[in-house]
Structure formats: structure tokens, C-alpha cells
Design a protein with these regions (language model features):
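Conserved FAD/dinucleotide-binding core of flavoprotein oxidoreductases
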Residues: 170-223, 244-255, 267-270, 274
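Extended charged low-complexity segments that act as oligomerization/scaffolding linkers
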Residues: 4-12, 159, 207, 267
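Extended, composition-driven regions rather than compact fold-specific motifs
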Residues: 20, 43, 48-54, 58, ...
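Long, low-complexity C-terminal extensions of enzymes
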Residues: 266-404
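Predominantly flavin-linked oxidoreductase catalytic cores and closely associated redox partners
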Residues: 63-206, 261
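Conserved mid-domain beta->alpha element of the FAD-binding
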Residues: 226-292
Length: 404
């Protein structure tokens, strides 16, 4: 239900990014908090290890949440589900035949030729169907470009099997932890211009303990942050890594892929398309992508950590014009759904980060005194504590779920 960011800004600090805002008596708790900002909004980041989205042993879909999923198992599951509706050809593309600015056909390694009106390029950074695409580099706005990733087994499942993702800031970057039923997916994100891959592997294995993971078990992932200026180009639509990538923080890669898929579905729902639709698609994607870049960049905007990596971040950090405007307007008008930047992340996400990074936020215009606001917040927190006391732990739920 949240992402936990320990040691961001400075060691010992904690930042929480819940997936929803808290409401009590039909009043948004963020609005009340804006009247009494001395009361820490961090108290609403639930580090207690219970699962708040469970209702009668099922997922309560009325509460925003995320899944910790084994990607390989998910791919197998989807493939099994669609096999009667979609023709699956398991082969590699060896030749892309083009006519002017469009793809005419694909020749596969198994000898099959594929002809289509519209092609979706999900071939990753290589972008086999549109390798000469015009790209927009983000190297001057982002700070990491490499990760080493692996799997660790639980040592203390009750402490480590959390109902949230962790992004732990460390001296050379940050470490993600994604606990699933049987193990923890984890990786170290860093800048290879500052830290070598071998040094990063050594740091990462020391972090977890070499009895849990060793350098030979780690996969190296490289990228250059960028986005495709025209992801819909002719009759090719680039989706996923072929359209752009920021970095692993906040899972924007998956979110952007889903956004593209839904936008494409919207544009071709009548089984027709033209240059106007493709240009609108490209414009909407660029605006959405830029909003994600600004939100991720915000995470790095204030740091007092002094290691070489974090000093590089603070020395080279630049606010985009858009991010500067968001910060400035938030100090004049409290961000709400009707008065906040459009994009992947709602007003609540911006509030949680801006407030916990101690950017100035305006008071919301609600009819309540500062004294009443404090009483309201204390009462709300008491309610949360009462609810948490009645919930089963995340680990208990997973054990129960395995038996049903």
C-alpha cells in the first residue's frame, strides 16, 4: 500500500509514499494537516506490518494498492490465459522490411513472414522496428544508469516480508526490496561513472551478507535515461523500453507501459487511425513522461548526504521549469486533484513528497481552526492505531492465502 524510503535526504530520515490519501468523516486528512503542519505527516506512513487491503480473505479493490509479483510467473499466467484468443509465435525477428516510413513485413528466424497494418515494438532498448528513432536524452536531469539485481531468501520472514516496497538510500545510490511469498527481489541502483560494477556488486553483497547473495548471482542492467520523441511513428508504436526509460524508482517503467497501452487502445477503438491520432498520442505520451521525470527528479532534489554519489547529485541537480512551477504554486495554493500537475502521480503523491522534503505548502482553505485541526489529526491517528491492532499481519495473511 506504500513505498518506504529510509535514509533519503539524510541518514536516519524516513519518507513514506502511500498509494492513497487518508480520509476521516469525509474530510481529506491532507487538508486538515495543511492547517497544522507542525504535526508530522510521516505519522501516516504505516510501517506496521499488517495488510490494510485485505477484506474477508480477498483483495479490497476499493483501496489503492500495488502487487509484489514474480514477473516470470505472471508472464506464464498471461500466456496461458490468452492462448485461445491470440496466436503466439515464439521466434526472433531477423529482418525488418520497410517501405518509406512504415514497416511492410517482418521475417522471423523460423522462416515465417508477418504482415500487419500496425506493429507494436516491445523489443526493448534495441527498438528493432524503429532503430533510428529520434530520442530525447535525460542524462542531465537524472543521476543513475546501472543496477545489479538478484534474489535473496528470507532470514527473518516476520520482519522482512513487508506489505510495502522499500527503496533504501545508501552511499552509492539506493537499494530496492520487493518481498514476495517465497523470497525478496532486490537490486542496487547506482551511477557507473562514479562506482564500478565490481565495486557495486561488492557493496550490495556486503549489505545483504555474503551468506545470502554472492556477486556471481547478480545480473547487471545498464540503461541511458531517455524517451522517444515519436513513439508512434508511421505504422509502428513503440511501447515499453523502446519508447523510453527513467530509472527503477517509483516503478515508472511499468506505469508508462500501461499508460501507452491504454492510450493506444483509446486511439484505435474504432479500428482506424491517422496522423492526427498518432500526433495526439505522441503529445500525450511526452507530457505524461515529463511528469514522471519531474516526480522522480524531485526525490533527489534535497540531500545532505556527503558520499561521492550524493555530492554529485547535489552539485549537478537542476530544477526543470515545470518542477519549479509546481513547487512555487504549491506554496501559494494547496495541491488538490483540481489544482495539481496532471500526469501519472496524483496530488496526494506530490503532497507526501513535498511535505516530507520540507518544501513550503500553502494552507488549504477549509473552515477549521489550528486547534481543531490538531484534535482532528490526533483522533484520526487513534482510529488508525485501533484498526491496525485488529488486522492480521501481512505474513499471517500470506500463510492463510496459501492454504485456500
Amino acid at each position: 500500500c506504500a513505498i518506504y524510503f529510509p535514509d533519503w535526504i539524510y541518514e536516519g530520515n524516513q519518507i513514506w509514499h502511500p498509494f492513497e490519501s487518508s480520509n476521516h468523516q469525509s474530510i481529506d486528512i491532507r487538508s486538515v494537516w495543511s492547517l497544522n503542519q507542525n504535526y508530522s505527516i510521516r505519522d501516516y506512513g504505516s510501517k506496521q506490518n499488517f495488510n490494510s487491503v485485505i477484506k474477508e480473505n480477498k483483495i479490497n479493490t476499493s483501496i489503492p494498492h500495488g502487487y509484489h509479483i514474480d514477473a516470470a510467473k505472471l508472464a506464464f499466467y498471461i500466456r496461458k490465459k490468452i492462448k485461445d484468443k491470440v496466436t503466439i509465435i515464439d521466434s526472433e525477428v531477423v529482418v525488418v522490411n520497410k517501405t518509406k516510413n512504415s514497416v511492410d513485413s517482418l521475417i522471423l528466424a523460423n522462416g515465417i513472414t508477418i504482415k500487419s497494418d500496425l506493429y507494436i515494438d516491445c523489443t526493448g532498448f534495441k527498438s528493432l522496428l524503429n532503430p533510428n528513432r529520434k530520442t530525447n536524452s535525460l542524462k542531465d536531469r537524472l543521476f543513475v544508469n546501472t543496477a545489479v539485481a538478484g534474489i535473496v531468501q528470507y532470514k527473518n520472514v516476520n520482519e522482512e516480508q513487508n506489505p510495502y516496497t522499500t527503496a533504501h538510500a545508501v552511499d552509492i545510490g539506493w537499494i530496492w526490496k520487493i518481498p514476495t511469498k517465497s523470497r525478496i527481489g532486490t537490486g542496487l541502483v547506482f551511477n557507473k561513472s562514479i562506482t564500478s560494477v565490481d565495486d557495486a556488486k561488492d557493496f550490495f553483497c556486503s549489505y545483504w551478507g555474503r551468506d545470502r547473495i554472492t556477486p556471481d548471482k547478480l545480473r547487471v542492467i545498464d540503461w541511458t535515461p531517455y524517451y522517444n520523441d515519436t513513439p508512434w511513428d508511421g505504422n509502428v508504436v513503440s511501447i515499453g523500453l523502446s519508447a523510453g526509460f527513467i530509472e527503477p524508482l517509483e516503478s515508472t517503467g511499468l506505469a508508462l507501459s500501461m499508460f501507452q497501452a491504454m492510450k493506444l487502445k483509446e486511439k484505435i477503438k474504432d479500428n482506424t487511425w491517422d496522423t492526427i491520432k498518432s500526433e495526439l498520442y505522441n503529445l500525450e505520451y511526452k507530457e505524461h513522461f515529463e511528469s514522471c521525470v519531474d516526480f522522480v527528479s524531485l526525490h533527489y532534489s534535497k540531500t545532505s548526504r556527503t558520499s561521492e554519489f550524493w555530492k554529485f547529485v547535489s552539485d549537478t541537480y537542476k530544477y526543470s521549469d515545470r518542477l519549479n512551477t509546481i513547487i512555487s504554486l504549491s506554496s501559494e495554493r494547496f495541491p488538490t486533484n483540481s489544482c495539481s500537475p496532471k500526469g501519472q502521480f496524483p496530488s496526494s503523491a506530490w503532497i507526501f513528497w513535498l511535505s516530507q522534503m520540507e518544501y513550503p505548502l500553502a494552507n488549504d482553505n477549509i473552515n477549521m481552526s489550528k486547534y481543531d485541526a490538531e484534535k482532528f489529526i490526533i483522533k484520526h491517528k487513534s482510529l488508525l492505531d485501533s484498526l491496525s491492532a485488529r488486522q492480521i499481519t501481512h505474513t499471517e495473511y500470506l500463510r492463510k492465502f496459501n492454504k485456500t
